[in-house]
């Protein structure tokens, strides 16, 4: 992974998170349909996240996280450092927003039930999309994809870090807990893993051609109707809005990344690079925090959804709030990982981590 490729993937990651934000903002109940053209691209951005995730996970498992302990702690800290604040924010804003404008919180806008405690508990264990379940932690619709992502992490860890009987048992248990709906999109995530493994197989002189071909393929696909070209079977056993389009888009994104890895990427100035890195660091927080903020500000900001002032304020407050909170949360990931490592070592009766020993001696 070169510095340039890492930077460009960071830009793609933030771009995908911003696309999801705009797609949710563009709904009629929030903005009166402003940017309606981008509404259906939110799901496409999530599929891009899956491919990027598979690529990055394959990379770190070969470089920085080469043991099950290191990998598991990193994934756990990555997820829960944002999930816990997101749960608190969602519960708080939902309760206030519902009291102000119940219409924005009807069942047609989210997968709500009459048992919010169970919803949050199942979501915390990533069981909200298992088998035929469709449960969310309050009105936080983007959380659906984390149920998929977390189980892909588990299945990958079982396949890479375990051997023999434990590997088979772990894969079977994870598969049964995840259920078929989550497994349907596993090939999209694995396309990212394949992109990492096969990136060096492409002759460098073909990298630019592959990039152009992928961009042209995506433009042509969307020009002819995009996901509307594909049959969308409806079943509780399938992911939401599932179609063969998911696999086509996933393949295009994976091939695009392989192309990026095989061209000479220009590096921007240091100031711009730092900006991209900082924004990319907020991507996960932006993704998971923006929806409750959009709902909340959609309820409290006065005026009709299609009013100019309402549109500007809701967009600015929700985006600024999500980015600001994400920038505060992101640094906690490293601290949480260190705390989890200490707790794990105590639980297993292992010596404390070196950092803890140094702290005690100082």
Q: Where do the model's predicted regions map?
A:
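Transmembrane beta-strand segments that form the barrel wall of outer-membrane beta-barrel proteins
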Residues: 170-180
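Generic detector of well-ordered alpha-helical packing
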Residues: 11-14, 48, 150, 331
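Membrane-interface helix-loop-helix regions
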Residues: 58, 79-150, 154, 249-261
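Membrane-proximal lumenal/periplasmic loop motifs of glycosylation machinery
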Residues: 35-42, 107-111
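Alpha-helical transmembrane segments of multi-pass membrane proteins
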Residues: 73-86, 160, 281
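Hydrophobic alpha-helical transmembrane segments of multi-pass integral membrane proteins
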Residues: 17-20, 50, 84-88
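Hydrophobic core segments of transmembrane alpha-helices in multi-pass, intramembrane catalytic enzymes
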Residues: 43-53, 148-152, 184-192, 249-253
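Alpha-helical transmembrane segments in multi-pass integral membrane proteins
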Residues: 1-8, 15-18, 22-40, 58-70, ...
């Amino acid at each position: 992974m070169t510095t340039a490729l890492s930077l460009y993937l960071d830009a793609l990651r933030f771009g995908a998170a911003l696309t999801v934000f705009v797609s949710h903002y563009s709904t009629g109940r929030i903005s009166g349909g402003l940017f309606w053209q981008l509404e259906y691209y939110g799901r496409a951005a999530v599929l891009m996240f899956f491919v990027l995730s598979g690529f990055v996970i394959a990379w770190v498992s070969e470089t920085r996280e080469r043991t099950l302990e290191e990998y598991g702690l990193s994934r756990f800290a990555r997820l829960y450092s944002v999930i816990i604040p997101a749960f608190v924010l969602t519960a708080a804003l939902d309760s206030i927003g519902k009291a102000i404008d119940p219409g924005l919180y009807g069942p047609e806008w989210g997968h709500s039930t009459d048992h919010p405690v169970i919803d949050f508990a199942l979501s915390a264990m990533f069981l909200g999309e298992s088998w035929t379940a469709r449960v969310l932690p309050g009105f936080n619709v983007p959380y659906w994809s984390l149920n998929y992502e977390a189980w892909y992490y588990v299945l990958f860890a079982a396949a890479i870090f375990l051997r023999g009987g434990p590997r088979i048992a772990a894969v079977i248990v994870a598969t049964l807990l995840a259920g078929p709906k989550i497994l349907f999109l596993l090939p999209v995530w694995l396309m990212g893993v394949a992109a990492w493994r096969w990136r060096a197989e492409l002759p460098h002189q073909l990298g630019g051609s592959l990039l152009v071909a992928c961009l042209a393929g995506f433009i042509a696909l969307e020009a002819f109707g995009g996901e509307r070209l594909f049959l969308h079977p409806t079943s509780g056993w399938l992911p939401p809005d599932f179609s063969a389009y998911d696999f086509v888009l996933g393949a295009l994104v994976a091939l695009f990344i392989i192309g990026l890895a095989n061209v000479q990427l220009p590096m921007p100035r240091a100031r711009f690079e730092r900006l991209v890195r900082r924004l990319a660091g907020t991507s996960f927080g932006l993704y998971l925090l923006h929806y409750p903020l959009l709902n909340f500000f959609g309820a409290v900001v006065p005026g009709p959804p299609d009013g100019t002032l309402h549109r500007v304020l809701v967009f600015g407050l929700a985006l600024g709030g999500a980015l600001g909170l994400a920038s505060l949360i992101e640094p906690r990931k490293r601290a949480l990982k260190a705390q989890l490592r200490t707790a794990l070592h105590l639980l297993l009766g292992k010596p404390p981590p070196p950092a803890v020993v140094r702290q005690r001696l100082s």
